[in-house]
Amino acid sequence: MPSETLWEIAKAEVEKRGSSENEGDGAEIGEKSVFFIGSKNGGKTTIILRCLDRDEPPKPTLALEYTYGRRTKGHNIPKDIAHFWELGGGTSLLDLISIPITSDTLRTFSIVLVLDLSKPNDLWPTMENLLQATKLNIDKVIMKLGKKNSKAASEMRQKMWSNMQKDHPDRELLDPFPIPLVIIGSKYDIFQDFDSEKRKVICKTLRFVAHYYGASLMFTSKSEALLLKIRGVINQLAFGINKSKSICVDQNKPLFITAGLDSLSQIGPPPLPDNDIGKLHARSPMDLWKKVYEKLFPPKSINTLKDVKDPAKDPQYAESEVDEMRIQKDQELEQYKRSSSKSWKQIELDS
């Protein structure tokens, strides 16, 4: 029997890769994506740099930023690649969420929501707006994927329940996020000095939200020990390293709860007297927790866009030649506006 030609070998390899991508669940794919969203100045960049072992000061994220990391699996084995996306501006740039979420990346995509624990009044609206916008975009991609590959879309919907045991008592009461979700509460060093009752409400609320969405929940700060634990969790998302099974639900310590290990019975009811809960008109359990939380921490009615600075004037993006040309063009524009204004006034006088 004649030996295979180089062309036949290459063709067989391509077909093999194609079939494995269609049949597998994405666990063996060497490229994964992690998308960081959350509170403005909440520490997202710091976490990413720590995970990538980059010793450099974090810079403010302007809009949507990208970087990547690589990990060696062994000798003569291709490196795993992790794509890290970060959305800046808190909730002011929701339109950019759709950019990294595509049908090509969704099967190996994860979301990390970083919430600033030191600003409890901003916590719920930040969390709600970002998760709703992200879920909306993911649902659109899954729906689009279903029209081309119904099997892949079906596998994604089934995978949503992978973190929840089949016999978990809360299984019928939850609504898992479409893709892996990790919620990180940052600035625990400030949060730990809060009044105990406030800490209790925040901890219980975040535990409920994380459990409802089938997400992991953990707190972090500048502490090296906590950053190492967070790094382990992110590495699991980015490179498929073994998932941690540790758990800490003590509100007097940094929470660390892996997805699927909490329960509604352990979390308990919303922290409000029964007679007060009865007065709240809620459409769903999530709505009830929201009303209870905002009773203690009413959201501040602020314009989320007012803090977004003009990047053209940001010194970290300075380019002398470009800036000089910009000044010149701005002056020319102002001169044109003045001359145009005079021309129109002259026309009005003549008429």
Swiss-Prot record:
Keywords: Cell projection, Cilium, Cilium biogenesis/degradation, Cytoplasm, Cytoskeleton, Developmental protein, Dynein, Microtubule, Motor protein. It is found in: Cytoplasm; Cell projection, Cilium; Cytoplasm, Cytoskeleton, Cilium basal body; Cytoplasm, Cytoskeleton, Cilium axoneme. GO terms for biological process: intraciliary retrograde transport; intraciliary transport involved in cilium assembly; regulation of cilium assembly. The keyword Endoplasmic reticulum does not apply. InterPro entries: DYNC2LI1, Dynein_light_int_chain, P-loop_NTPase. It comes from the Eukaryota. Residues 323-337 have a biased composition (Basic and acidic residues). GO terms for cellular component: axoneme; centrosome; ciliary basal body; ciliary transition zone; cytoplasm; cytoplasmic dynein complex; microtubule. GO terms for molecular function: dynein heavy chain binding. Belongs to the dynein light intermediate chain family. Light intermediate chain of the cytoplasmic dynein complex 2, a multisubunit complex composed at least of eleven different proteins. The cytoplasmic dynein 2 complex consists of two catalytic heavy chains (HCs) and a number of non-catalytic subunits presented by intermediate chains (ICs), light intermediate chains (LICs) and light chains (LCs). PANTHER family: CYTOPLASMIC DYNEIN 2 LIGHT INTERMEDIATE CHAIN 1, DYNEIN 2 LIGHT INTERMEDIATE CHAIN, ISOFORM 2. This is Cytoplasmic dynein 2 light intermediate chain 1. It comes from Bos taurus.
